[in-house]
């Protein structure tokens, strides 16, 4: 969707992280795809809003953080069951299998990381921390 603005926020220094490039690529693409789909779902109901995704990458020495922040439909429809989205076969999508986020979670755990889903009033924040 060319109307979605994606901002990358990062330092100019190189980041080094020992991990499986293909698996980590799958994680990042899946999460960004989910953000895009969330914004598209919101656009079906709300016609006039700025469609934004920001992706922030930080190196804190002992760990690396990746934060994906979007202004889509968010997690509000999950009530207090945000952790359920990591369960295999849990889906909120009409044609979803429910495997995407459970696979994402496994890959992150296999890389000594953890993922956090943070609801906000207008969208969602996904925060991943990888220990070095």
Task: Describe each PLM feature range.
Residues 16-19, 92:
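Conserved micro-motifs of the catalytic ATP-binding
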Residues 100, 104:
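Short alpha-helical Gxxx[C/S/T] motif in the catalytic ATP-binding
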Residues 108-109:
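Detector for a conserved hydrophobic position within an alpha-helical segment of the HATPase_c
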Residues 24-25:
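A residue-level detector for a conserved hydrophobic packing site
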Residues 36-61:
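ATP-lid-like helix-loop hinge signature
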């Amino acid at each position: 969707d060319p109307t979605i603005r994606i901002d990358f926020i990062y330092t100019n220094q190189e980041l080094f992280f020992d991990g499986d490039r293909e698996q980590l690529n799958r994680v990042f693409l899946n999460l960004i795809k989910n953000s895009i789909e969330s914004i598209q779902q919101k656009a079906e109901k709300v016609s006039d809003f700025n469609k934004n995704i920001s992706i922030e990458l930080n190196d804190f020495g002992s760990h690396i953080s990746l934060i994906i922040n979007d202004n889509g439909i968010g997690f509000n429809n999950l009530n207090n069951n945000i952790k359920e989205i990591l369960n295999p076969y849990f889906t909120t999508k009409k044609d979803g299998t429910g495997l995407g986020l459970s696979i994402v979670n496994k890959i992150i755990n296999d890389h000594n990381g953890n993922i956090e889903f943070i609801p906000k009033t207008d969208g969602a924040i996904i925060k991943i921390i990888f220990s070095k």
